[in-house]
């Protein structure tokens, strides 16, 4: 568990660490100023889209060969695709490396599947909640650390550092992660169709996939306009610092709450915790649209993090309980696929809403998306759920 947590932390940090200066790096590669935003968006979305499309393939291989080999494969390849960004001569090569990075990604979903397969099911919420804090902490610390390191070391040196971090992650996984897994012959691998047939509820599973996508849409739709919204609320001095602080507030509260809420889900039922977290998230997004000061927005974002701390552990625990162990990696890979699609769609939805309707409309729209998802999950749980099957 500890090594998987560290691996998730390093993976989350390595991705988020380079985001603050990606646009500047693309500008330094000679891209015209009027195309910088386009190529920056493409560099981010290309990796997420590629990861989404190939995730089911890696999931099937993980169910046959084990999750640990897939974790090692992902971290070793990303050592070169992320570290190699330090040597790109132009934006075309950068985009190629970002594409390869997405194709060979998959450390986090395989680490999740490994813990889900080996942890006692009655304690899966706590185990997966604890694991989720690794990604949260890495994603939280990454941007702050990346900006400081780029200032003192230079952008290319930061890419080399990220490659080194991922190499350490690869070695930790290779030597210290333990998995009880026996190689399965190709003819004996359960087909994906049978995995879904033997799950306890395909309807609920599909709803959980969509919920993972909605979580990312809601997060990424707000991300492009958050600093602009903060300025709209009257913050003009130290705008980047204040924006980073408000983003970090969400991650900090999520980090504090994930393990406890995962344990709470094991006690009261993860379906109940998920519904509560979705309605709570809807309420906080709606209130963010009504914020009149930066302080109010910061407090609301901090409170929203407690909802985030319950969402993914609840989804992962429910998927674990609904899925036959022989196909658990594929189910988590499909969940990752939907999550990646959300990462791609979110910024476009948020930017379009802000352009045509204003900044507050982004929060109103996001709250309605989350509310719709809450109602769908409520319908699914009331219609298809047999509580005894997921305990």
What does each model-found stretch correspond to?
Residues 97-135, 318:
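Cytoplasmic helix-loop-helix junction between adjacent transmembrane helices
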Residues 158-175, 363-379:
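Symmetry-related core transmembrane helices of the 12-TM Major Facilitator Superfamily/SLC fold
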Residues 1, 179-208, 391:
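Juxtamembrane intracellular "pre-TM" segments in multi-pass secondary transporters
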Residues 81, 92-100, 284, 295-303:
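Paired small-residue
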Residues 21-37, 225-241:
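Short amphipathic helix-loop junctions that connect adjacent transmembrane helices
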Residues 53-89, 265-271:
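Conserved MFS/SLC helix-loop-helix module at the cytosolic interface between two early adjacent transmembrane helices
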Residues 1-24, 28, 201-219, 302:
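Pair of pore-lining "gating" transmembrane helices in MFS-fold secondary transporters
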Residues 42-58, 248-260:
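Central cavity-lining transmembrane alpha-helices of secondary-active solute carriers
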């Amino acid at each position: 568990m500890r090594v998987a947590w560290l691996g998730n932390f390093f993976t989350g940090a390595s991705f988020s660490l380079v985001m603050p200066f990606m646009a500047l790096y693309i500008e330094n590669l000679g891209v015209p100023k009027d195309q910088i935003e386009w190529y920056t968006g493409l560099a981010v979305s290309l990796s997420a889209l590629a990861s989404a499309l190939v995730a089911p393939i890696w999931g099937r291989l993980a169910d046959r060969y084990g999750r640990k080999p897939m974790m090692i494969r992902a971290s070793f390849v990303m050592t070169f695709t992320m570290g190699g960004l330090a040597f790109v001569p132009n934006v075309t090569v950068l985009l190629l490396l970002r594409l390869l990075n997405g194709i060979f990604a998959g450390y986090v979903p395989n680490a999740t599947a490994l813990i889900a397969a080996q942890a006692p099911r009655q304690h899966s919420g706590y185990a997966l909640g604890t694991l989720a804090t690794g990604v949260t902490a890495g994603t939280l610390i990454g941007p702050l650390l990346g900006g400081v390191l780029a200032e003192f070391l230079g952008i290319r040196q930061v890419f080399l550092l990220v490659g080194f971090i991922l190499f350490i992650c690869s070695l930790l996984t290779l030597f210290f992660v333990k998995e009880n897994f026996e190689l399965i012959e190709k003819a004996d691998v359960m087909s994906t169709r049978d995995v879904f047939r033997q799950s306890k509820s395909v309807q609920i599973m599909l709803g959980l996939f969509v919920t993972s996508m909605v979580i990312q849409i809601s997060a990424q739709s707000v991300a492009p306009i958050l600093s602009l919204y903060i300025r709209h609320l009257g913050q003009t001095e130290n705008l980047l610092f204040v924006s980073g602080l408000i983003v970090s507030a969400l991650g900090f509260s999520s980090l504090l709450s994930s393990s406890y809420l995962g344990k709470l889900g094991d006690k009261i039922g993860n379906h109940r915790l998920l519904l509560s977290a979705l309605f709570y998230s809807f309420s906080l997004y709606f209130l963010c649209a009504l914020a009149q000061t930066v302080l109010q927005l910061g407090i609301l974002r901090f409170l929203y993090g407690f909802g985030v701390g319950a969402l993914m552990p609840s989804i992962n625990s429910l998927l674990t309980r609904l899925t036959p162990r022989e196909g658990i990696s594929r189910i988590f890979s499909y969940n990752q696929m939907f999550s990646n699609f959300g990462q791609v769609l979110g910024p476009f939805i948020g930017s379009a809403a802000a352009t045509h309707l204003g900044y507050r409309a982004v929060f109103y729209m996001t709250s309605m998306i989350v509310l719709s998802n809450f109602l769908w999950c409520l319908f699914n749980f009331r219609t298809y759920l047999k509580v005894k099957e997921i305990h």
